[in-house]
UniProtKB/Swiss-Prot annotation:
Keyword RNA-binding assigned: yes
Disruption phenotype: Males deficient for both for Tex19.1 and Tex19.2 have impaired spermatogenesis, small testes and are infertile. They show vacuolization and seminiferous epithelium degeneration as early as P16. They have defects in meiotic chromosome synapsis, persistence of DNA double-strand breaks during meiosis, lack of post-meiotic germ cell and up-regulation of MMERVK10C retrotransposon expression. Number of females double knockout for Tex19.1 and Tex19.2 surviving 2 weeks or more is reduced compared to males. Females display normal fertility. Surviving mutants do not present gross somatic abnormalities.
Keywords: Cytoplasm, Differentiation, Meiosis, RNA-binding, Spermatogenesis
Keyword Cytoplasm: yes
Compartments, as annotated in UniProt: Cytoplasm
CC annotations in GO: cytoplasm; nucleus
Protein name: Testis-expressed protein 19.2
Biological process, per Gene Ontology: cell differentiation; male meiotic nuclear division; spermatogenesis
Organism annotation: Mus musculus (Mouse)
InterPro entries from the UniProt entry: TEX19 (IPR029093)
Function as written in the Swiss-Prot or TrEMBL entry: May be required during spermatogenesis, probably by participating in the repression of retrotransposable elements and prevent their mobilization. With its paralog, Tex19.1, collaborates with the Piwi-interacting RNA (piRNA) pathway, which mediates the repression of transposable elements during meiosis by forming complexes composed of piRNAs and Piwi proteins. Interacts with Piwi proteins and directly binds piRNAs, a class of 24 to 30 nucleotide RNAs that are generated by a Dicer-independent mechanism and are primarily derived from transposons and other repeated sequence elements.
Length: 317
């Protein structure tokens, strides 16, 4: 499989480089690096290509020789990892032609009349985006090396509009991959934004895909959707809502219910890891008294409310 080159996620606020980062997270060798450090490493490669600071030994004409070579890459001159500026990995390798004026032609079985031009955006239009660069053996950045956080510390900040959330899960028992994927994609994730009395505002988080990685873990990409309003049977304590920050809307014997995501996933045979250490406080079974559970009477989209009016494009109105 090739890394994504088109901006098919652009409509959802996802840049091409962010899509490439997600691709390496899913299909890479258990890469543990945040997007900021991944972008910093990409900019280093881009700047060196533009300045022509590559040594002759770096530019190998045969990409196959690069993938089969066992020699360790040399240290990059002038690079140092540190917090605030991002951790620049030690093992970066680039494969490109000696001219480096653009992408090399790729053999294809399609005829000229069958070729379809790629819908490239402004970011892909840069010549550096078209180069067949790659990072082999990205070192984990220091941003992952943090003490364990509690559930509400991890989801203390609401995701920005259009910003997806990536969850990393591990199965607790053997399961069929197709059934596991279908079950994960079918979950109704929501992100609690706040509320008052028995009214709760939440952001729908739709699973875009669920894939199994090479290290026998699962990754689920949650895409923010519409803001919804839920009417609860009982008004919960505001400090207790942190436990339901990321929840799954389920049907129970008492009706619709908001279940914390880690508890809902555990019932399906998954333990949540994400890319931040999760506090090991998930109970073995989610069983609380009816008065302590968030039972939902009705859920409607915020746009469907009579009093809701879309904001005017005119800032003076």
């Amino acid at each position: 499989m090739c890394p994504p080159v088109s901006v098919r996620h652009g409509a959802k606020g996802m840049s091409c480089l962010y899509g490439a980062w997600l691709y390496h997270l899913v299909h890479g060798e258990q890469m543990k690096i945040c997007f900021a450090c991944f972008k910093a490493a990409f900019l280093v490669v881009k700047n060196m290509l533009e300045m022509g600071d590559w040594e002759e030994g770096v530019w190998d004409a045969e990409p196959m020789e690069l993938s089969e070579a066992s020699s360790e890459p040399e240290e990059w001159p002038g690079l140092s990892g540190g917090e605030g500026q991002g951790h620049l990995p030690h093992g970066i390798s680039v494969s490109a032609g000696s001219g480096a004026q653009g992408p090399q032609p790729v053999p294809t079985e399609l005829g000229p009349q069958e070729a379809v031009p790629l819908d490239l955006g402004p970011e892909d239009a840069e010549w550096t985006q078209a180069l067949p660069w790659r990072f082999d053996g990205l070192s984990p950045c220091s941003h992952w090396l943090i003490p364990p956080l509690s559930w509400w510390e991890i989801f203390n900040v609401s995701p920005s509009p259009g910003q997806p959330v990536l969850l990393e899960l591990s199965p607790t028992w053997p399961m069929d991959p197709l059934e596991a994927e279908a079950w994960l994609v079918g979950l109704k994730f929501v992100f609690l934004l706040g509320g008052f009395d028995a009214i709760c505002y939440m952001l729908s988080m739709t699973p875009c895909w669920a894939v199994r990685t090479r290290v026998q873990r699962w990754q689920v990409l949650l895409d923010p959707g519409d803001v919804r309003v839920a009417q609860l049977q009982n008004a919960p304590e505001q400090q207790d809502l942190h436990r339901w920050k990321l929840s799954v809307l389920e049907s129970s014997e008492l009706g619709m219910e908001l279940v914390p995501a880690d508890c809902s996933l555990q019932k399906g045979g998954f333990k949540v890891h994400s890319y931040l250490p999760w506090h090991n406080s998930t109970p073995e079974s989610w069983s609380r008294e009816p008065g302590e559970r968030l039972l939902v009477v009705e859920v409607v989209s915020l746009r469907e409310l009579p009093c809701f009016r879309s904001p005017s494009p005119d800032p003076h109105n």
